[in-house]
Each structure stands twice: as C-alpha cells, then as structure tokens.
From Swiss-Prot:
Name used for this protein in its record: Elongation factor 1-beta
Organism: Pyrobaculum neutrophilum (strain DSM 2338 / JCM 9278 / NBRC 100436 / V24Sta) (Thermoproteus neutrophilus)
Family: Belongs to the EF-1-beta/EF-1-delta family.
Matches recorded under InterPro entries: eEF-1beta-like_sf (IPR036219), EF1B_bsu/dsu_GNE (IPR014038), Transl_elong_EF1B/ribsomal_bS6 (IPR014717), Transl_elong_EF1B_B_arc (IPR004542)
Record keywords: Elongation factor, Protein biosynthesis
Gene3D superfamilies xref list: 3.30.70.60
Amino acid sequence: MSAEVALVYRVLPESVEVDIEKLKTSVINKLSPKYKVDRVEVEEIGFGIKALRFFIRMPESDEYSSDEVEELLRSVEGVGGYELEYFSRLSF
C-alpha cells in the first residue's frame, strides 16, 4: 500500500456576505472525487466572519499536488484566501 499525504487548508470567504455552507459545498465539489475531504470545520473569527478548515488526503504520487489543490481553491467563487496549515506524509 502506498503512502498518503495529509493536508489542512484554512479557507477564508471573500466577504461576510458569502454563505459559508454554500462555500463549503462548492469547495468539496471542486476537490472531489480526485482529493478526499475527510472533515471540514467551521471557525468563528469574529465580526460575523467565519473560516473553513478542510482536512484533505491524497495519494503520494506525481498525479496529485498541493499546487493543484490551491489552483482548485482559487477557482471556487467566494474564496477570498487560503492558507496551508499542515502538510504531512502518512504511512500505514
């Protein structure tokens, strides 16, 4: 069995007006089925602003990359910014 890579991205909406649940669904739909979204957390930042934290797994392979994940995130309407918080190789 090959190793996998775990990524955690924090995604911020463009504005307070962005529906956080719709943004969450849009990001999941954009990443799937190629990238596995294990979990999504909603983080209250303040002043009505919320961030999303996506826990993503992908095979350790040249066909998958964090650069591609970031391209996909940039292409989602409503995404104002993102940050890679965690990157680790998983092996079982």
